[in-house]
Regions:
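N-terminal, polar/charged subdomain of small-to-medium soluble alpha/beta proteins
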Residues: 1-129
Length: 129
């Protein structure tokens, strides 16, 4: 969802950047057998006005709980594609937080097995209600 289509009350975000976990995702046998590091960025759009006024954790996105959910997915059952990992994370964030209207999830695979030099390979998805 582009910023031009968001309602004026969903421009607030909760961001989690650079979450690092060890998982066994990939197409190659070595990736699923040995595993590797994955780096996750997640942004969740939600009106934070009520949380700002109430100072109550129940009125916002609990990033400790979100971190644990993301960790469980990345460290959980192997997937062939990081696109699948990103989809599961996005679905989890939307399911766990009814106030979240949109999520953006990036999954980076910094140690991809390619013949060549690169910093990272990754995908970014955006999902909205």
């Amino acid at each position: 969802m582009s910023s031009s289509t968001r309602s004026p009350y969903t421009g607030d975000t909760v961001r989690m950047e650079g979450l690092e976990f060890y998982g066994h995702h990939g197409v190659l046998a070595a990736e699923t057998d040995l595993g590797q590091r994955f780096v996750i960025d997640a942004t969740m759009w939600s009106c934070l006005r009520k949380a700002g006024a109430s100072d109550d954790l129940g009125d916002t996105v609990d990033y400790t709980r979100s971190y644990e959910s993301i960790r469980d997915i990345v460290e959980g059952p192997p997937r062939k594609l990081i696109e699948s990992v990103a989809e599961e994370i996005a679905a989890s964030m939307l399911a766990d937080y009814p106030r979240v209207t949109e999520v953006r999830v990036s999954v980076h695979k910094p140690n991809v097995a390619l013949r060549g030099t690169l910093r990272t390979v990754g995908v970014t998805i955006e999902r909205a209600r």
